[in-house]
Amino acid sequence: MEFRTATPADVPSLYALWTAAFDAPLMVPVYETDGGRLDRTVVAVLPGPTPAEDRVVASVCWTPRTLVGLPCPTGPDGSTTTLTVGGVANVASAPDQRGRGLVRLALAEAVEQMHAAGMDASLLFTGTPGVYRPSGWETFEVPVTRGLLLPDGAARPERSSATVVARHERRSRTEPPVPTTFPAWSPDLPWQDLATLHDAFHVAPLTTLRTAVHWEHRIPLWYSAAELLTARGPDGSIVGYLVVELEGEVLRVRELAVGPGGATTPERHEALDVLALAARSLAREHGATRAEVRLPRVPAAAVLTDTLLTAEDRETASDATGMLRPVRRSTAEIDALRATTSSPTAGFHWPGDYL
C-alpha cells in the first residue's frame, strides 16, 4: 500500500472509487472547479503491474478557503480576523479495504500538507462525525427551525407601499441538469448583484469569503437543485434574495440576503415580506406544507421565519454536520470559533459554500 499525492494517471481509478462509495452526482463537477486539485488529493494506492493499473482504494482531498474569524479585539467595532482553512472533501475508501485505517492515515497526510501550506485550521462537513473526531475534528452547530407553513389566508404584514416585488428567477429549459457556470438561473442576472448583498448581509465567524470562482462555478453547482427568489425595487435593482429547495412536502431555506439596515426598516422588511410570501406560493405550487429554515441567529432571519411558519408546532434544532480542526492556530482559538454559532456574533456557514 502506498500513500501519495494523486497524479493524472490516477484520475480514472479515483473517480471509480467515488462512484462506488457515494451517490453524489455533484462530487466530480465540484472537485473539478479546483485548478490545483490533484496536488491536494491524498490517495492510498494498491500498485498494479503497471502505473496505469494502479488502484486507488482511499482518498482525501482538501482545498484552501478563507473564512471570517473571531472579532478583532484591537480593531474598530465590527472588525474581524480571517483564517485560511483547508476544506476537506471526497473522503472515501473502497468497500473491500475498509477497517484498515486507510482514511485515518490519509487524513493525517492531508493535515501535514495543510500545515506545510500555512493553513490555520481545517473544515469539513459530514454525517458521520465519529470518523473524524479521533483525528482532531470537532463539530459546530448552526440553528435550524422546522414547522408548518402559514396557510394561504394568513394575514400579511401591513406595508406603506408596494414598491418591492418578488421575482422567481426561473431556469432556462435548455440548461443541462447540472449547470457548471453562472448564471444558474436567469441569464440577465449578474452574480455581482447577489455577491454585493451577500457580502454585506452577515459578515460573521465561519462565513466563507467568496471569490469570483465561487460565484461563477461552485454556487451554481451547490444550488443546482434550488430555486432563487429575488426582491426587486421599482428600478429593477435587487434588494434581497432567497434560495430555497423543495423536497417532497418540505421547503428548505438555504440562503438569505437583504439590503442594509435593521430588520424593521421599511425597504428591508418589505423585501423579507415579499420573499417569504413568494416562497410560500412556490411551496403551494409543489405541494409542500412544511419548511426547514437554516439561517443565522439574526433579526432578519427571525422576521422571515415568522412570515413563513405558523407560531405553533415549531421545532428548534441544530445542524451539526460542520467540523473544525486546528492546524497552525491554537485549539483554544478554534474552540472559540466553533462556539460563535450560539453567541451574539452568530457564526454561520452557508450550504452554497460546502466543500
Regions found by a protein language model. Give the residues of each.
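Active-site rim helix/loop that mediates acceptor-substrate recognition in acyltransferases
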Residues: 15-77, 205-228
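Active-site/acyl-donor-binding loops of N-acyltransferases
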Residues: 136-157, 254-355
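Conserved acetyl-CoA binding element of GNAT-fold acetyltransferases
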Residues: 82-95, 249-266
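Well-ordered mid-protein domain cores that form the structural environment of catalytic cofactors
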Residues: 4-6, 56-112
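Amide-forming acyltransferase catalytic core, primarily the GNAT-like/NAT-type
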Residues: 138-261
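Conserved beta-strand in the GNAT
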Residues: 43, 52-65, 85-92, 236-246, ...
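Conserved beta-strand-loop-alpha-helix junction that forms the acyl-donor binding cleft
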Residues: 115, 120-133, 293-302
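Conserved acetyl-CoA-binding loop-helix of GNAT-fold acetyltransferases
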Residues: 88-93, 99-112, 116, 124, ...
